[in-house]
């Protein structure tokens, strides 16, 4: 038996290069399927684009998204575009999962270990990029991380008993961990000294290069 997964996600540009942005947005949308233990099968583009912006930029965004969908082994079956003052891109993704191995973002148990598949700090590095204060090493690292599919991690976790799982995105580790703990009627203890972070994140944070959403996440967590 198979269960159907349907999800969507889109956002404004987080990279200067439109091709990179397309890949990042697609990887982000596909991640929701992997977080549930599923396999993406088809995807539809979700696009908002300004009428006075070079259409070649849109072409590069779509090319990046298409390449990432292909990398995931899924089929890009079309999409929809609207006119907007700010470009936005993402995907609606359809996938399948074995209902006996469907991972939810609740059900964590006492004694469970928290495992991260990627280093933290993308929001801080992107803030440094916008301020033109980023190092080249940090720029390359954050782009590689955001473009990387969680497919391999998903396949590894299928070999183990997983009680709860989520993907860490806009609400950060604190927000998503809190959400999972509350839904599981548990608390979570995090040793911040052991958290993996992207290059130069601590330096950027000490400079005050922290996205506004991080403060809201802290209040929630």
Predicted features along the sequence, with ranges:
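Acidic-glycine-rich active-site phosphate/pyrophosphate-binding loop
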Residues: 1-5, 147-154, 221
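Alpha-helical scaffold segments that flank or form the walls of functional sites
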Residues: 19-36
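Short, solvent-exposed amphipathic alpha-helical segments in soluble enzyme
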Residues: 20-24, 107-108, 130-133, 177-185, ...
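Alpha-helix C-terminal capping segments
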Residues: 31-39, 179-184
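Glycine-/charge-enriched secondary-structure boundary and capping motifs
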Residues: 51-75, 82-87, 159-160, 165, ...
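Active-site glycine-rich loop that binds ribose-phosphate moieties when present
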Residues: 92-102, 136-158
């Amino acid at each position: 038996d198979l269960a159907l997964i349907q999800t969507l996600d889109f956002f404004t540009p987080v990279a200067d290069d439109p091709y990179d942005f397309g890949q990042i947005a697609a990887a982000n949308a596909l991640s929701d399927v992997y977080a549930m233990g599923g396999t993406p099968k088809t995807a539809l583009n979700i696009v908002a684009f300004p009428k006075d912006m070079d259409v070649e930029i849109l072409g590069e965004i779509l090319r990046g998204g298409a390449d990432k969908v292909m990398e995931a082994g899924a089929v890009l079956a079309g999409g929809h575009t609207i006119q907007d003052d700010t470009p936005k891109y993402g995907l609606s993704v359809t996938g399948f999962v074995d209902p006996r191995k469907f991972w939810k973002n609740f059900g964590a148990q006492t004694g469970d270990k928290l495992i991260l598949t990627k280093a933290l700090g993308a929001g801080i590095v992107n803030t440094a990029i916008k301020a033109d204060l980023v190092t080249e090493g940090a720029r390359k690292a954050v782009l590689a991380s955001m473009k990387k599919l969680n497919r391999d991690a998903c396949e590894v976790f299928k070999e183990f008993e997983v009680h709860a799982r989520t993907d860490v995105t806009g609400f950060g580790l604190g927000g998503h961990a809190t959400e999972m703990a509350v839904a599981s009627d548990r608390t979570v203890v995090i040793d911040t000294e052991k958290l993996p972070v992207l290059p130069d994140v601590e330096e950027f944070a000490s400079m005050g290069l922290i996205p506004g959403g991080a403060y809201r996440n802290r209040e929630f967590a």
